Regions:
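Flexible, glycine-rich surface segments
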Residues: 155-243
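A short, structured surface patch at a secondary-structure boundary
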Residues: 2-82, 88-95
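Extracytoplasmic substrate-binding proteins
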Residues: 66, 77, 83-90, 96-177, ...
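Ligand-binding cleft/hinge of the Venus flytrap
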Residues: 39-41, 54-64, 104, 187-201
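A short, gly/pro- and small-residue-rich
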Residues: 43-44, 102-115, 236-245
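Beta->alpha turn/N-cap motifs
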Residues: 92-96, 229-232
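Stable alpha-helical elements in mature extracytoplasmic
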Residues: 20, 30-34, 40, 77, ...
Length: 245
């Protein structure tokens, strides 16, 4: 709501969120990039997981003190959150994360950013329209989404014409554990739309599935492409260190 004079009917289960947000605590680097695309940098008051962020202007703002470094998204810095006094917290509801701990008890409105739980790439992309309304950028967000949607469908029509489908193994292990997209996830759909044969397309479910290194290696040896997402510079030596196979 934009009517700050409305009578309060907040409870433990329900909070009033006043829009547009002017000082948000953003917990994911993904959403920082999205907000930057919409031109809402000034509404970002604090961010988590700075080490995963590649936006130079945000890092500079943190260095200058214009944006608060809130630490880990799993255990945000409570003192800095209190000092920030944000309009809302924007965390992602990662499975088995244990919630936000003490941050949930501070009384700030929490807007769970569940876009990663969508089972199609365009379904996830359309969440920008929701964020656009939170930050007073509805028209900008709608325009961005329509461009992305049109381009995505155009690319899909091209990949459907290909005769060969390279076999794809995605991801790397995290802390020694492989977790790969299940068949109903947006990632699996993305691989399919890109014209690849995802070698673990038989994994049931909509999220991710933990797998043993043995199983990944056994089937991964059949892959033509190993698709790795990494937030920094990556070389073969580092891959061998992080992924001893």
């Amino acid at each position: 709501t934009t009517e700050k004079s409305l009578p309060s009917y907040e409870s433990r289960e329900r909070k009033i969120v006043f829009i547009p947000l002017e000082r948000a605590a953003v917990f994911s680097s993904v959403h920082c990039a999205l907000l930057h695309e919409m031109g809402t940098d000034k509404a970002v008051g604090g961010i988590c997981d700075l080490e995963f962020l590649n936006l130079a202007n945000y890092k500079e703002a943190v260095k200058d003190g214009r944006i608060a470094n809130l630490g880990s998204s799993m255990q945000p810095n409570i003192e800095r959150l209190i000092n920030l006094n944000p309009d809302a917290l924007l965390p992602s509801p990662f499975e088995n994360s244990g919630g936000l701990g003490r941050a949930e008890k501070l009384g700030f409105p929490i807007i769970w950013c569940a876009d990663y739980m969508e089972n199609t790439p365009l379904g996830r992309a359309e969440w920008i329209r929701f964020y656009g309304r939170l930050f007073g950028k509805a028209e900008v967000a709608d325009s961005i989404f329509h461009v992305v949607e049109s381009r995505y469908k155009e690319l899909c029509s091209l990949t459907k014409q290909t005769q060969t489908k390279p076999r794809l193994l995605p991801e790397m292990p995290w802390s020694g554990q492989w977790t790969l997209p299940s068949s109903g996830s947006y990632s699996a759909k993305l691989y399919q739309d890109a014209g690849a044969e995802y070698i673990f397309a038989d994994l049931k479910g909509n999220g991710s599935t933990p797998l043993s290194t043995e199983k990944v290696v056994d089937r991964g040896m059949q892959a033509d492409i190993w698709l790795i997402k990494h937030h920094g510079t990556l070389n073969r030596r580092q891959i061998n260190t992080d992924t001893p196979l």
